[in-house]
Design a protein with these regions (language model features):
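Catalytic loop of short-chain dehydrogenase/reductase
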Residues: 14-23, 94-133, 137-179, 191-193, ...
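C-terminal helical subdomain
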Residues: 122, 186, 205-240, 245-249
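Hydrophobic structural elements of the Rossmann-like NAD(P)H-binding subdomain
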Residues: 12, 90, 142, 184-187, ...
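Conserved glycine-rich Rossmann-like NAD(P)H-binding loop of the short-chain dehydrogenase/reductase
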Residues: 34-48
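A short hydrophobic alpha-helix cap/turn motif
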Residues: 30, 84, 135-136, 175-180, ...
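A glycine/serine/threonine-rich, flexible loop-to-helix segment
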Residues: 50-51, 179, 189-214, 254-267
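Conserved mid-core segment of classical short-chain dehydrogenase/reductases
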Residues: 64-73, 77-84, 88-114, 133, ...
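Canonical Rossmann dinucleotide-binding motif of NAD(H)/NADP(H)-dependent dehydrogenases/reductases
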Residues: 2-38
């Protein structure tokens, strides 16, 4: 796919480390010729992101707290000073108090509910509003979601609710921005051992269950997600918007445990 993204520029938000879904997408975009900028939050995250940026020759890094609208404005102003226009944005952002990603959903506190919804769902709306101003010739906005938005996944709790809001936001934004030739889509990735996933209770059990019951009898990789991301952000998907695209080895089509799947314990 060398050259598929040649001449295109975009911002990747939420890259955490080399296990991130965003990293899988960033590598594919870079290999296809895209020019990238990264955003991160805080000095600790910068230490992780900067070496990755160097690997891909990314020179534009921005510290951005998406829950702070002034900080978000400053990030896009700084990006606009470098690039007057962009072609795509990857929104790979979500956060919740990990102590509430175990146990029962009704134990979610109001403060954590509001914070999780703000960072994990509303931030896409805020980002899209600002990205739109830098996409006079159209573009593509891509976010990341999970099957816990559609069905109950143990311990996913308030993140499932936030991802459901995120997925619905994708559809409303797709309508708002479609006339401007700006496409908005989401990738619903199967469970992968990422930094964010480590905070979910019994995650290894969820991972193994998916492996044993998905039609392809495996879990997905960041390379799988990266390939789908490249498609969604390139002109190959020029007629696609408002979609929740599953990259989960087919797990989302399964209605019950596979006949040949062994029983597994939580431990």
């Amino acid at each position: 796919m060398t050259g598929l993204m040649q001449g295109k520029r975009g911002l990747i938000m939420g890259l955490a480390n080399d296990k991130s879904l965003a990293w899988g997408i960033a590598k594919q975009l870079s290999d296809a010729g895209a020019e990238l900028a990264f955003s991160y939050q805080g000095a600790a995250m910068e230490k992780r992101v900067r070496p990755l940026a160097e690997q891909l020759g990314v020179a534009r890094l921005f510290d951005c707290d998406v829950s702070d609208m002034d900080a978000l404005d400053a990030t896009f102003d700084a990006l606009k000073a470098e690039w007057p226009t962009i072609d795509f944005v990857v929104h790979a952002i979500g956060f919740s108090d990990k102590s509430q990603l175990r146990g029962r959903y009704y134990d979610t506190t109001l403060d954590n509910f509001l914070m999780t919804m703000n960072i994990s769902a509303y931030s896409l709306v805020a980002v899209a509003k600002r990205a739109r101003e830098m996409m006079p010739n159209g573009g593509s906005i891509l976010t990341l979601t999970y099957y816990g938005a559609e069905k109950v996944i143990p311990h996913y709790n308030v993140m499932g609710v936030a991802k459901a809001a995120l997925e619905t936001s994708v559809k409303y934004l797709a309508v708002d921005l479609g006339r401007e030739n700006i496409r908005v889509n989401a990738i619903s990735a199967g469970p992968i051992q990422t930094l964010a996933a480590r905070g979910i209770g019994d995650f290894n059990y969820i991972l193994k269950w998916n492996e044993l019951n998905a039609p392809m009898r495996r879990t997905v990789t960041i390379e799988d997600v990266g390939g789908a991301g490249l498609y969604m952000l390139s002109d190959l998907s020029s007629g696609v918007t408002g979609e929740i695209h599953h990259v989960d080895a087919g797990y989302n089509v399964i209605g019950m445990k596979a006949e040949d799947a062994p029983d597994i314990a939580l431990a």
